[in-house]
Design a protein with these regions (language model features):
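Catalytic core of soluble alpha/beta enzymes
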Residues: 240, 245-373
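N-terminal small/glycine-rich loop or linker at the start of catalytic domains
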Residues: 167, 192-216, 251, 256-258
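Conserved, mostly hydrophobic/aromatic
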Residues: 75, 117, 141, 180, ...
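Flexible C-terminal active-site loop/helix
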Residues: 74-90, 101-105, 353, 369-438
């Protein structure tokens, strides 16, 4: 075997082989050839012989550690975990933000483990103790990825979508694929010893401005109290889920100019009704008007509301793919795009949507009614995208947060994690205490 070479700096390089570099294998030699550092083609390297094994640098927890060039990682184990976490939101329970009222928030996790023992976490969009979705993932999705190379993120995503597209392009199956995609990105970051935002191109900020996404209270008193609590906690952006005009006006008045207000009404009206209500609210200077018309895929109808010119229109949390956003933007339906990482194909799909939005001058503000890995992935993606001004956080309090204090906003802002991968691990207490035996 050819001995290690030295380049002009005198540093020893690893053994080389032809082919493109893959990120992820901690057994791969660290130091890339000098042309890789200067922007040239990066060559993958094979592990050195035993005599040189002591020179391998393994990933460290710090964000500034050296990148490890990855050869391959095999998915050895995969399982789902369903949690039901009680929460409080003020007022009279149960609470809603447009759907069925509830006292607890369900989180469907996927846990992937490689043959090297690395663990990656993902999250599927889930509501109402979704045992059916868990079983779908356990029986249809996870068996298809066992033994696959975890560094082949796009390839795995495409193969799953192609094999299972008859189940629908916006469905529980797609939510499960999104969860797997998030977990694969977590694995990649951990294998490289790098935070996810760095793999996405670097962060524009180390913390994000958060908007408090309030529950739908349905009465003025509870809503005004919740609005004031959000202001007291330092939030300067507040989203309402109310559909009553009296409630909306009362909350805007309670803000007294201290916070910008947007409303998310969850598609309750016909297009003519949405046009009329948009006109009723035109004096409130709303930050945006979200999903005013039914059905959510009626992009031409949504475009009519936008063409009225009274409010900026936001939508996208019910879209399933890049092509849905292409149709939305082509119809002139939105000012703000809101894909959900746990619904719309994971990080891989949202990266494409972000580029599409940037090319068309549409704001990219991901939807995030999530408290698991989907929430953390959205933090990283938002930090890495220049045109994302704010980050969504549902305004409620848990007995135990899945990530402890790390994802609780302070004075209306949230820190971007700096550890490898997602940078955070679920708190064992939460996994044990709130896990459903299904």
């Amino acid at each position: 075997m050819r001995p290690p070479q030295r380049h002009s700096s005198g540093r020893r390089t690893g053994f080389r082989r032809s082919g493109a570099a893959l990120l992820g294998d901690p057994l791969c030699y660290v130091s890339p050839p000098p042309q890789a550092l200067d922007g040239g083609a990066v060559r993958a390297v094979t592990p050195p012989p035993p005599a040189y094994r002591k020179r391998i640098k393994k990933p460290r927890a710090e964000a500034d550690c050296e990148i490890n060039w990855v050869v391959a990682m095999k998915i050895a184990n995969a399982k789902t975990i369903l949690l039901s976490m009680p929460f409080e939101a003020g007022g009279t329970p149960p609470w809603s933000f447009g759907g069925k009222p509830a006292n607890s928030f369900d989180i469907l996790l996927v846990r992937l483990e490689t043959n090297d023992g690395l663990v990656g976490w993902g999250e599927a969009f889930s509501r109402g103790r979704d045992i059916a979705l868990k079983q779908t993932m356990d029986t249809r999705l996870l068996p298809l990825i066992l033994g696959r190379d975890a560094t082949q993120i796009s390839k795995i995503k495409h193969s799953l979508e192609f094999q299972l597209h008859n189940f629908g392009r916006i469905s529980g199956v797609e939510y499960g694929i999104a969860a797997i995609d998030i977990a694969l990105w977590d694995l990649l970051g951990k294998a490289c010893g790098q935070p996810l935002y760095r793999l996405l191109g670097g962060a524009y900020a180390d913390e994000l401005e958060v908007y408090a996404s309030l529950m739908r209270y349905g009465n003025v008193d509870d809503l005004v109290k919740a609005t004031r609590r959000a202001l007291d906690r330092g939030y300067r952006y507040i989203k309402l889920h109310e559909i009553g005009l009296d409630e909306i006006r009362a909350a805007v008045k309670a803000c007294a100019g201290k916070a910008k207000v947007m409303i998310d009404v969850n598609c309750p009206w016909t297009v003519p009704e949405a046009l009329a209500i948009a006109k009723e609210l035109q004096d409130l200077d709303l930050y945006w008007f979200e999903e005013p018309a039914w059905p959510p895929e009626n992009y031409l109808g949504l475009a009519r509301v936008r063409q009225q010119g009274l409010h900026r229109i936001a939508a996208g949390k019910n879209a399933g793919s890049l092509h849905d956003f292409m149709s939305m933007i082509s119809a002139g339906a939105i000012d703000i795009a809101q894909p959900d990482v746990a619904k719309t194909g994971g990080l891989t799909e949202l990266l494409k949507i972000a580029a599409l939005c940037e090319a068309h001058g549409v704001e990219f503000v991901p939807h995030c009614a999530l408290f698991g890995p989907g929430q953390v992935a959205t933090i990283h993606l938002s930090a890495a995208h220049r045109s994302t001004p704010i980050f969504e956080r549902l305004f409620c309090d848990f007995e135990v947060e899945l990530y402890g204090d790390a994802t609780i906003p302070k004075n209306g802002k949230i820190k971007v994690p700096t550890g490898p991968g997602l940078g955070l691990e679920p708190v064992p207490e939460a996994l044990e205490k709130f896990r459903l035996s299904v």
